């Protein structure tokens, strides 16, 4: 029996379709009234759910590499040694960009050095004297960049990242630390106490990767092309690599440096040749160009102590009384050599060698050494020095 209603005293029939529309309209109206009355509570509930989700994201970031499985003796942030760790390395193509006239931005990644393990506390392979000062002209930190930076007066680092890549097994014991010191003339840390006080520091096991991001300030500084009295005025800071707690002195990893630097104000090309001269008393008289090595002598031994890895050509001379005897210690290979002895007056030498890790030295033994001079430049094994 159909429902009826009266309109103007007339009886009208309502179909099932019309009845459904009326019911839906009534339901929508009731829902709208409920939302209007309950809107504050619904809004508060939505805000609460948002806060819970945000807190979960923050907690995950704070946990970092924390293991999902709890390991006995481990705390938050600890990692478990896997069976094997491997990293595939690919070549880095340098990128050049320029937004303003007279400047260029260089982005690249370079190999810095091999890291050897040590039982005691060792910084920068035992080489002291502010080895890794952050300046694009520093030939002991960069091998590729100085050839470009030597054509500019000023620089500004946009980003700098140190990346430690292991090459040892997960059974290797010890620690590897990367740090940054804002003062480029500060002495290297003497022990683990001083190391731990650095604000920009990353430590890891020899078998685990690590990255250290260096803070930059966009300040324009001068490229180091002369003998500067206060290095901290031209350097962004200095980097350091420390090892300790190991069971030997074997190679455990490599360190790469990635950077983006803007160079300003082109200038005549500065020298990439390193010159070191000792006077008659054995004191350093002149030091120009990159600090590839330190030249010292005793009355019987002239010593070249390398401060950076790579292949180099050395040409030098010394006042002495007898013939020269070549010697080498550490990870250095003599590729080619020519020595000219003038017994009783002076001798000269030309040398091509490859240094794969520090420390490494090349020596000449004779008698009656007084003054000496050596010029050093990066080269390749094809730069032979012997006579045909």
Curated annotation (Swiss-Prot):
Chain positions covered by the region annotation Involved in encapsidation: 57-63
Annotated localization: Virion
Post-translational changes noted in the entry: The N-terminus is blocked.
Domain of life: Viruses
Pfam family name, one: Viral_coat
Residue span of region R domain, interaction with RNA: 2-102
Record-given protein name: Capsid protein
Organism name: Tomato bushy stunt virus (strain BS-3)
